[in-house]
Curated annotation (Swiss-Prot):
Name of the molecule in the record: Putative pyruvate, phosphate dikinase regulatory protein
EC number(s) from the headed UniProt entry: 2.7.11.32, 2.7.4.27
Catalytic reaction list: N(tele)-phospho-L-histidyl/L-threonyl-[pyruvate, phosphate dikinase] + ADP = N(tele)-phospho-L-histidyl/O-phospho-L-threonyl-[pyruvate, phosphate dikinase] + AMP + H(+); N(tele)-phospho-L-histidyl/O-phospho-L-threonyl-[pyruvate, phosphate dikinase] + phosphate + H(+) = N(tele)-phospho-L-histidyl/L-threonyl-[pyruvate, phosphate dikinase] + diphosphate
Molecular function in Gene Ontology: ADP binding; ATP binding; phosphotransferase activity, phosphate group as acceptor; protein serine/threonine kinase activity
Alphabetized UniProt keyword annotations: Kinase, Nucleotide-binding, Serine/threonine-protein kinase, Transferase
């Protein structure tokens, strides 16, 4: 047995992070040894593979690779045999298994993960946007949003904004209160980008009463007063009519269901709900 420091060459047509994570996870299973990892990203041709394997052979390195182009994978395997190097194909077996399972052909597109990276950062931006422009904190967000949610308190504007943010949708929300005029920005955006949210007064009364109880406050406050709730809902509906936006009655609907309706409206341009 030897405790000689093993060397792993990471060869990838992208950044090589996948193979690096796997290699480090495997090496971590062996205490008392250190592992050298040499990562070579963006390998696109056979000449580059030749150069890498020539260097790897000097250290009798293990080759871990993520190459989606089959021709390059086959070439690497053959050349590695010539040098007596051991190889590990990180992606190939799983791609083949998925193809066998689904009956579909893989695209064999190198560096396709950048698409996922773009989706991830779009989601992060949308989440930060939702937090920044929640509950009418800054009315300028109305002009920047993909969608603006309006409604009285406790109609799920904030959770819906966050849910949509996780879909990459930038959502701002504005509370509608009879004593406070909505920001003028609300009337400057296209009405199809605004969604009105409402609930049946009985349900809203229950939700607000429970909210007060959770906060340790009495249920006699105007916030949970039935007549006050009806007044707020009528006021809000008037604002929604003035804006000319679709209105969703979220009574009895889960957040996911309401969000699905919002997305349908945005993508299909529906006017009446």
């Amino acid at each position: 047995m030897t405790k000689e420091m093993p060397v792993i060459y990471i060869i990838s047509d992208a950044l090589g992070e996948t193979a690096e994570y796997v290699s480090r996870a495997a090496a971590a299973q062996f205490s008392g040894i250190r592992t050298k990892i040499r990562k070579v990203p963006y390998v696109q041709d056979e000449i580059h593979i030749d150069e890498i394997l020539e260097e790897a052979a000097k250290e009798q390195a293990i080759i871990a690779y993520t190459l989606v182009v089959k021709k390059l994978r086959n070439y690497l395997e053959e050349k590695a045999k010539d040098y007596g190097l051991r190889t590990v194909d990180i992606l190939g077996p799983l791609i083949k298994m998925l193809a066998d399972q689904t009956g579909l052909l893989p695209s064999y597109t190198p560096n396709v993960t950048h698409i996922l990276d773009e989706q991830y950062f779009r989601k992060v931006d949308a989440i930060e946007f939702a937090v920044k422009y929640d509950d009418g904190k800054d009315p300028r967000g109305v002009l920047l949003a993909d969608v603006v949610l309006i409604g009285v308190s406790r109609t799920s504007k904030t959770p819906l904004s966050m849910y949509l943010a996780h879909k990459g949708i930038k959502a701002a929300n504005i509370p509608l209160v009879p004593e406070v005029s909505p920001p003028q920005e609300l009337f400057r955006v296209p009405s199809q980008k605004v969604i009105g949210l409402t609930l049946k007064p009985d349900l809203l009364n229950q939700i607000r009463t429970e909210r007060l109880r959770t906060l340790g406050l009495g249920s006699s406050a105007d916030y949970a007063n039935y007549e006050r709730i009806v007044e707020e809902l009528e006021y809000a509906r008037g604002i929604m009519r003035k804006v000319g936006c679709p209105i969703i009655d979220a009574t009895g609907k889960a957040i996911e269901e309401t969000a699905s309706r919002i997305l349908e409206i945005l993508y299909k341009g529906e006017r009446n709900v």
